[in-house]
Amino acid sequence: MKLDLTVLEQARLLVVGDVMLDRYWHGGTSRISPEAPVPVVKVGESEDRPGGAANVALNIAALGAHAALAGVVGEDENADLLAARLEACDVSTYFYRSPEIPTITKLRVMSRNQQLLRLDFEESLWEIDTQGLTERVEAALPEADVVILSDYGKGSLNRVETLIATARGAGKRVLVDPKGHDFAKYRGASIITPNLGEFEAVVGPCPDDATLAEKGERLRAELELEALLVTRSEKGMTLIREGHAPLHLPTHAREVYDVTGAGDTVIGVLGLALAAGHGYPEAIMLANLAAGLVVAKPGTATLSIAELYTALHGDKLAEFGPIEESALIDAVRAAKLRGERVVMTNGCFDILHAGHVAYLEQAKRLGDRLVVAVNDDASVGRLKGPKRPINALERRMQVLAGLSAVDWVVPFGEETPARLIAEVLPDVLVKGGDYRPEDIAGGEAVMAAGGEVRVLNFEDGVSTTAMIDTILDREG
């Protein structure tokens, strides 16, 4: 089962739901109040983070995809703050600003990374007219592949049946993070993701996996869902689909620091993976992995694509030096996800000399990692004649790998490295000599992918052929 993270940035998601502002006051405490038996916190720092449905959208944007957010907020300063924070993180906002309610705000008082108190500033949204939100959802739908409904039970989704019908009618897959004891209102969605407590509140106790699967399938069929995902804390997750055996995944959490926002991460990554073309099993595996990472962070937190990739492939990352093509492709992909700029060049490098070293050092300065593709022995013979190479491929690769400028060395046997370069897709393709960029093998593929092609000068008076001729003249 292969999970390709590089396609995630192509996904477009619309999140609709209860938008909140999570505010944190951090401070130290060393005494008890003389007024009441409570600690006194000397506040030294204040922090604001998007919460609720806004945290779902933020998780999606942090992984490089396009996220839009629709929700109900007040006509107040906190709504302005939320919009600014989200748009700074590339989340498009479709807020319905109601004069009837304040923006939902949760204030947490923290000391030594422990929550001492939470204060909620909110009014019920159940009685207000949210037609304005429906109109904003309809405006945002054409630009979305998947719709996520993030229900915190605050009332923003008091027209949830209409929203599901509208999105499904537009051909969009709909994911729901549910709330409450009435799941019937989510009928017709693609998948819902209750936690075990929410699930058992609706279907009754599930003492074992078999009971959970049986009751889950019954609920899935009743609600006409494609799938049902039950998140089970330390027991992981269970996916139930029509015509398939239940899929039980163990938790990936090594350390649980704070479960705040974990459900947001699960449904955000799940929707992202589905929008990018993955199936339910692959998407659930990725969401489960992401949940295990985010609970190790304090407060409402997001993940980067690099963190997710490292967790997924950390034990498979390639060592530097000589490498096979498939391993190189994975290594370059990992480097890019870490934000590193990859440079690639190629050649025979039969007898390594000072000109080669200067050229490779110049190439390395154009990025963070340098890949050198080396002609194998047969292709060197075809290019240079039957008496070449002087040094066999293994020795040439070993010498190149010993240079501080070179990160990976990979062989190729074709007449040109065009196919290999198109597979690797470096950020910068480099060639020495008097070539035009458009004439360099592989350059077209690199430029089409948004990379660049650079031509560097060789050091005058130094070449492998000249060195060989000099040696032969002296021996003669």
From Swiss-Prot:
Instruction: Read off the InterPro entries from this record.
Output: Bifunc_HldE, Carboh/pur_kinase_PfkB_CS, Cyt_trans-like, PfkB_dom, RfaE_dom_I, RfaE_dom_II, Ribokinase-like, Rossmann-like_a/b/a_fold
* GO MF annotation terms: ATP binding; heptose 7-phosphate kinase activity; heptose-1-phosphate adenylyltransferase activity; phosphotransferase activity, alcohol group as acceptor
What residue spans carry the region label Cytidylyltransferase? 344-476
GO annotation, biological process:
ADP-L-glycero-beta-D-manno-heptose biosynthetic process
Top-rank taxon of the source lineage equals: Bacteria
What chemistry does it catalyse, as a reaction equation?
Answer: D-glycero-beta-D-manno-heptose 7-phosphate + ATP = D-glycero-beta-D-manno-heptose 1,7-bisphosphate + ADP + H(+); D-glycero-beta-D-manno-heptose 1-phosphate + ATP + H(+) = ADP-D-glycero-beta-D-manno-heptose + diphosphate
Function of this protein? Answer: Catalyzes the ADP transfer from ATP to D-glycero-beta-D-manno-heptose 1-phosphate, yielding ADP-D-glycero-beta-D-manno-heptose.
**Know the name of this protein?**
Bifunctional protein HldE
The UniProt annotation places ATP binding at: 195-198
Q: What class of enzyme is it?
A: transferase
PANTHER family per the UniProt record, alphabetical: BIFUNCTIONAL PROTEIN HLDE (PTHR46969:SF1)
Q: Give TM regions.
A: none
One annotated Gene Ontology cellular component of this protein: cytosol
Task: Tell me how this protein assembles.
Answer: Homodimer.
Region: Ribokinase; residue ranges are 1-318
- The active site lies at 264
Enzyme Commission numbers on file: 2.7.1.167, 2.7.7.70
Show which residues constitute the signal peptide.
Answer: none
As for family, the record states:
In the N-terminal section; belongs to the carbohydrate kinase PfkB family. In the C-terminal section; belongs to the cytidylyltransferase family.
Q: Which controlled-vocabulary keywords does the entry list?
A: ATP-binding, Carbohydrate metabolism, Kinase, Multifunctional enzyme, Nucleotide-binding, Nucleotidyltransferase, Transferase
Name the pathway it acts in: Nucleotide-sugar biosynthesis; ADP-L-glycero-beta-D-manno-heptose biosynthesis; ADP-L-glycero-beta-D-manno-heptose from D-glycero-beta-D-manno-heptose 7-phosphate: step 1/4; Nucleotide-sugar biosynthesis; ADP-L-glycero-beta-D-manno-heptose biosynthesis; ADP-L-glycero-beta-D-manno-heptose from D-glycero-beta-D-manno-heptose 7-phosphate: step 3/4
